[in-house]
């Protein structure tokens, strides 16, 4: 990919998702805590996506539910050491934003980040709302993205003794819709609230804050952040392939091999979907039509390929491919990088 685009992998989205953990002796499972009242055995798949193409650059399997600066820097260093790709920008979810992360990535540091501010103690999440409350609804701060009207404003703040930009947003469509739903179900509860709290509830369900060391407009930064939704598509695709191995197969080597196989499958499906986007055809339909060509190998290594139907030829044509009548085994292995 870097031969085609030298910038591939330099700007990345990083996120993680829980893997199936129903098997007790999964070697990567670890006990992790969720708040004060629950704990769970968990393994997480960490994915790094190229921000331009949306394709996986790197993945790792981590025990438990560790989402911190060490995880991020380990990923950055592994990608640099193994692939020679220096990641220079990161888009992270709230689980990664911490005091240590802000200390490593703030205004003036070389690498850039965008992260979602957690709504928990130690972060000025609601404080920022009260600071800009009277500006919400003003046309000066309004913009539209994908049919949703947003309020957005940027403030330079100090977070954990480091300078950072806070981008404060209200998705006014979501805020109004979900506030209306809340009122229908909790009208009596709402009536009991203080006036100040009632004001907060009118925006609560559309309010969020992004932190970044990038100096941009609120609209520009939000577009950059929302591109990370690509990673959710990849996770959804990946989970369609990440089926559980048989109980007897759960070893370090087999789990790593299974995940590698599934990431390759995921990448292939994503590339196929990207190529098919304008065709109006589903990926499953094309795979179903094209996967059943029979092949016969002769003693001299020549592989004869079944003659495809007219419709199958058309499907291959959508990918810019033609079906050869014959293939040399040695040539084919070299083309796909297999050792002879």
Question: Where are the model-predicted features located?
Answer:
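Anion-binding and metal-coordination hotspots
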Residues: 1-340
